[in-house]
């Protein structure tokens, strides 16, 4: 029954085709021409509607408790993930607000497309819900446009690295800062010289226009700016060279080889970063002077070359700490490989044992009244109330391998042997002087040739308490945003870690005691 119906349908179709073919070439041409005209008109109408009204899609509104996503412009997940991470750092946004206030004083409507700081501030405030917007997805192409004005050629269709873009942004902000005047206008005394019959009490200073405020070089540094200390100790005479300071915007840590049965931690990476290394064939001026004292008649002595021990420490810790875990490695054949090991990190990070000590400074004695309730309760460091970096380390362990940025002389002969690193089992955050809180994590999925960047970040604080820190975490992948747990964040394979310095409970209580006095 079914086969007979199918045969009948095929026969009817064949008859229609045969009638169309017998109509003649002229009729067939007219029919095909009419269908072509109709198809062209339909395509033109569709194109016109798209140009005038855009794509026919509903603009979604952002769900409550989430942040806006960012549209992927081709391969811009590296930029989107970095912006989401930076927007979770309130200290960086406050610095941008203070830095860009100079433009609002100079002109009523500053062109934001000319300044990286203004463009970045606008994006970060929108991503941190500090600007009123109901859009679920934002466009960050303006950042690429302003970076091109700073002579950075960044394509939105080529895969880039989020860590490299971070340094592009920080270096461009420093260039913008250096273009600003660092001295005030000279006082205009010409009008004072023309007034002859006045008393000294009537003399006042007059200016042409408002003078620029004197710029403090250290105050204008962005919150990610820190300093490393590097010093060298001669293994022969134990002479210590002068300390050298180098700046950094992020700590790029290599991942040491894992030991079977022992997990890798962020503390292991930090210890590997500051661990001492031997530098051979270095001229020691002190050894040369000692050798010259034993010569007769002022004979010239060749420069004495010995082995030095080089030691790194953190001389100035920034307000916002960016840590980069180097996941690039090279095989024996010279091909790049990605390291997928999980590096354990915590929500809070104590940096006391990595801080540089000045010789002769002793740990300060805390008020015994402050030790009654030593708990992990923390207060966010904010503005002028932030503690001034000090040189004592009350939270450092009693047994230390390194002292004052150099190796202890008793350990110099045994530096080649690996030494255990004392890691606290249960860290006491209440006594830490340099304590940091995790704000965002950038994760890279894929290999060294292609992949995708996503971000774990804290949700912005509520409008009722804008100075608080939210405990809600978000997972952001370009324009997709969802809630995440802290356990999911700590289980991720971090590529970039963003920490922000906070006050420990002991420091907060100490400030309260001083204010009461």
Curated annotation (Swiss-Prot):
Name of the gene: USP30
Record function comment: Deubiquitinating enzyme tethered to the mitochondrial outer membrane that acts as a key inhibitor of mitophagy by counteracting the action of parkin (PRKN): hydrolyzes ubiquitin attached by parkin on target proteins, such as RHOT1/MIRO1 and TOMM20, thereby blocking parkin's ability to drive mitophagy. Preferentially cleaves 'Lys-6'- and 'Lys-11'-linked polyubiquitin chains, 2 types of linkage that participate in mitophagic signaling. Does not cleave efficiently polyubiquitin phosphorylated at 'Ser-65'.
Main location group: mitochondrion
The reaction(s) this protein catalyses: Thiol-dependent hydrolysis of ester, thioester, amide, peptide and isopeptide bonds formed by the C-terminal Gly of ubiquitin (a 76-residue protein attached to proteins as an intracellular targeting signal)
Sorted UniProt keywords: Hydrolase, Isopeptide bond, Membrane, Mitochondrion, Mitochondrion outer membrane, Protease, Thiol protease, Transmembrane, Transmembrane helix, Ubl conjugation, Ubl conjugation pathway
Active site (record annotation): 77 (nucleophile), 452 (proton acceptor)
Membrane-crossing residue ranges in chain numbering: 36-56
Official protein name in the record: Ubiquitin carboxyl-terminal hydrolase 30
């Amino acid at each position: 029954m079914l086969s007979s119906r199918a045969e009948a349908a095929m026969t009817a179709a064949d008859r229609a085709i045969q009638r169309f073919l017998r109509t003649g070439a002229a009729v067939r041409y007219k029919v095909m021409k009419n269908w072509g005209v109709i198809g062209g008109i339909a395509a033109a109408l569709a194109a016109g509607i798209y140009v005038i009204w855009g794509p026919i899609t509903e603009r979604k509104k952002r769900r409550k408790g989430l942040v806006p996503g960012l549209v992927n412009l081709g391969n811009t997940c590296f930029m989107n993930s970095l912006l989401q991470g930076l927007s979770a750092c309130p200290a960086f946004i406050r610095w941008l607000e203070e830095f860009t206030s100079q433009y609002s004083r100079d002109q009523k409507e500053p062109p934001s497309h000319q300044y990286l700081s203004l463009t970045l501030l606008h994006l970060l405030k929108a991503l941190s819900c500090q600007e009123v917007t109901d859009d679920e997805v934002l466009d960050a192409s303006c950042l690429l446009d302003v970076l091109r004005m700073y002579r950075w050629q960044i394509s939105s269709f080529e895969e880039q690295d989020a860590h490299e873009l971070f340094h592009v942004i920080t270096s461009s902000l420093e260039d913008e800062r250096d273009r600003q005047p660092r001295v005030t206008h000279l006082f205009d005394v010409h009008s004072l010289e023309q007034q002859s019959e006045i008393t000294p009490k009537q003399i006042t200073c007059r200016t042409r226009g408002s003078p620029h405020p004197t710029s403090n070089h250290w105050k204008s540094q962005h919150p990610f700016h820190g300093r490393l200390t590097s010093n060298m100790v001669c293994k022969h005479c134990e002479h210590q060279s002068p300390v050298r300071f180098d700046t950094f915007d992020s700590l790029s840590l290599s991942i040491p080889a894992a030991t079977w049965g022992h997990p890798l931690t962020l503390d292991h990476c930090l210890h590997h970063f500051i661990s001492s290394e031997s530098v051979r064939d270095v001229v020691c001026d002190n050894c040369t002077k000692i050798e010259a004292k034993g010569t007769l008649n002022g004979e010239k002595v060749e420069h004495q070359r010995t082995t030095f021990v080089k030691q790194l420490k953190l001389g100035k810790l920034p307000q916002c700490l960016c840590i980069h875990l180097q996941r690039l490695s090279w095989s024996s054949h010279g091909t790049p490989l990605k390291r997928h090991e999980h590096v354990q990190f915590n929500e809070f990070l104590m940096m006391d044992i990595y801080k540089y000590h000045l010789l002769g400074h002793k740990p300060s004695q805390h008020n015994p009244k402050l030790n009654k309730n030593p708990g992990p309760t923390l207060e966010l460091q904010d503005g002028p109330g932030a503690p001034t970096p000090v040189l004592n380390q009350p939270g450092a362990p009693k047994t230390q391998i390194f002292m004052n940025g150099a190796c202890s002389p008793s350990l110099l002969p045994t530096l080649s042997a690996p030494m255990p690193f004392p890691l606290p089992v249960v860290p006491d955050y209440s006594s830490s002087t340099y304590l940091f809180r995790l704000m965002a994590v950038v994760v890279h999925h894929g290999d060294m040739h292609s992949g995708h960047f996503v971000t774990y970040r804290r949700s912005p604080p509520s409008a009722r308490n804008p100075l608080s820190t939210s405990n809600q975490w978000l997972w952001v992948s370009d324009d997709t945003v969802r809630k995440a747990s802290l356990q999911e964040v700590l289980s991720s394979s971090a590529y970039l870690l963003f920490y922000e310095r906070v006050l420990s409970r002991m420091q907060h209580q100490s400030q309260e005691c001083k204010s009461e006095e």
